[in-house]
Amino acid sequence: MGINGTSLADNNLSWGVQESYGTNGQGNGASANADWRATYGELKAAYDYDKNQRRLSYGIQGGVLAHEDVITIGQPLDSTSILIKAPGVNGVSVNNQTGVRTDWRGYALVPTANPFRKNTISLNTETLPNDVDLELTSKTVVPTKGAVVIAEYKANIGRRVILSLSRKDGSPVPFGAIASLNNGEQNSIVGDDGQVYLSGLPDSGILNVKWGKSIDEQCRVDFNLSSDSGSSEYSMRIIDRKCY
């Protein structure tokens, strides 16, 4: 008879216990085993005994990949594998990959991939830090046999807000206007009632808003989010701002 199962938040600890019986005590014995799969490797341990002997075994194994950015450590690698690259996004788990999480730099190893087929790698958004918003949460790659391919994710790291923008006369900024950060690297479209969602914002900066070519069809917002109250530093906020 025996029992087995999985434990921990990501079910990355698998274990089993078995016990056997024989006539007049002959063949009596028991065994237990555990396998812990984590970000930086895999740890196995087993113990069994019978009438004549006791045995204990254990081991640790993992994989190391040197690439152009850093060295990434993970679980034992198959001949075909995937490198997740999400700079600055640490501790995020990968769906359907037991124990795989991004390291402190934002890299992770998916130890096994299917060659010459589409492999979809999806990050678990429930494990994202509060100050991170991903442009895409899943990527599809097609590796050749024996290759290591990269699944790269672009993250906006910073504050997340919904700005309710109004013009000088108090009317909302028109639907469809383009709101751009002063560095021009991030654009968002204004929705109903002058509201625009922005992620990865710095504490302060300038937002340029444009819905036409004339000077009357554009405005700008100077923001300083550190002066606004909120439930926590990186929680979602809804803030009213005048656009001049």
Predicted segments with their positions:
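Flexible, glycine-rich linker and terminal segments associated
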Residues: 1-178, 185-191, 197-244
